[in-house]
């Protein structure tokens, strides 16, 4: 079911005059000077409404709001509303009754601003109608709309102006100063497994091995340039029985041999 159309009010003017106009003998436009402007046929209120795409010019009584005449407008500018050639305050409209009969009458406004608002209200409505028709066509045929072409034409060039950029402090690529140490000289420990070179004593110094002073041996062939230090002897391995201390401390108990003499008694 189609959505019901509602009637909206576009313009209301409280003072409008209606005139009888003589029939137009030629194709030239209407002239307000040919009307009896000092003797209007009717005076009242004008109201412009819209229902769907059709606008309606309604002439109503100022007090009761009773409808005097109505002019449906389906196109503007068009034959339903025409401007006169000698004034901007007067128009010719085509009124219709419920039986399909039509007649042309003249209307006029006392204020030029009211005539301007009347004209603009009709223009805005039909501008909206035109946009709605275009949107409906685009919705039905979306591929037929104009496509935006952003490609370069043959021989077309562009020019880019790039301003010089200043390097900021601490930017990438700028070496930073290493912070100075406030303490003494700090050395990293040697890596695990590294061999440390033995330090040779200076002249006049003696090497102490096992509590005794050892003099370095000088090689006669080298002219005293090479010093050969004796290597410390490995500790002698005790040849005594490892259980000797335990057997000595037992004293007389060792004379009493228990069964299984191969075991040491604690």
UniProtKB/Swiss-Prot annotation:
Keywords: Cell membrane, Cytoplasmic vesicle, Endocytosis, Membrane, Phosphoprotein, Protein transport, Repeat, Transport. The modification Phosphoserine is found at residue 181. Interacts with AP1G1 and AP2A1 components of the adapter protein complexes AP-1 and AP-2. Interacts with the GAE domain proteins GGA1, GGA2 and GGA3. Signal peptide: none annotated. The gene is NECAP2. Belongs to the NECAP family. InterPro entries: NECAP_PHear, PH-like_dom_sf. One of its GO terms (cellular component) is clathrin vesicle coat. Involved in endocytosis. Residues 247-258 have a biased composition (Low complexity). It holds the Pfam family DUF1681. The lineage of its organism: Eukaryota, Metazoa, Chordata, Craniata, Vertebrata. One of its GO terms (biological process) is endocytosis. A motif (WXXF motif 2) lies at residues 263-266. A motif (WXXF motif 1) lies at residues 243-246. SUPFAM superfamilies: PH domain-like. Residues 164-191, 244-266 are annotated as: Disordered. It is found in: Cytoplasmic vesicle, Clathrin-coated vesicle membrane; Cell membrane. The keyword GTP-binding does not apply. This is Adaptin ear-binding coat-associated protein 2. The WXXF motifs mediate binding of accessory proteins to the ear-domain of AP-1, GGAs and AP-2 through hydrophobic interactions. Selective binding to the GAE domains of AP-1 or to the alpha-ear domain of AP-2 is tuned by the acidic context surrounding the motif and the properties of the second residue of the motif itself.
